[in-house]
Amino acid sequence: MAYYGYHRISTKEQHLDRGIIEIKRFCENQKIKLESIFTDKITGKNFDRPRYTVLVEDVLRVGDTLIITELDRLGRNKQEILKQLRFLEEKGVRVMVLELPTTLFDLSQMENNLAKMMIETINNMMIELYASMAQAEMEKKEKRRSEEH
């Protein structure tokens, strides 16, 4: 059971350091041994990203945990985000999103099934909401760019 971080930026104005520091700080505070943080400097429109691909295809194993700071660092396309999260879940990889506190609970350790189902439901609703917001932000930026030309 290993912990890995992932952070993505897409513009020159963004800084990889912010996300890396946030992931490291979280792990230090929680006394989690972080193996490595994978980063990409590329758009979040799709998942054709070199370091993310290595992480998902070659590194992550059953029982591992992937830590990201914000859901939109995973991607900007709602359907692709949800597809990736399902893929990771099926692969047996837990995903922790630091901006979504309910994803920080280790549900496998919960004995109360009702509480577990409630937190899973809240997680799913929050992920749907945040994935929708990430896509809306991408569409707004694309519209602005097209209006500039």
Name these PLM-found stretches:
Residues 1-147:
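Short, structured surface patches at the beginning of a domain
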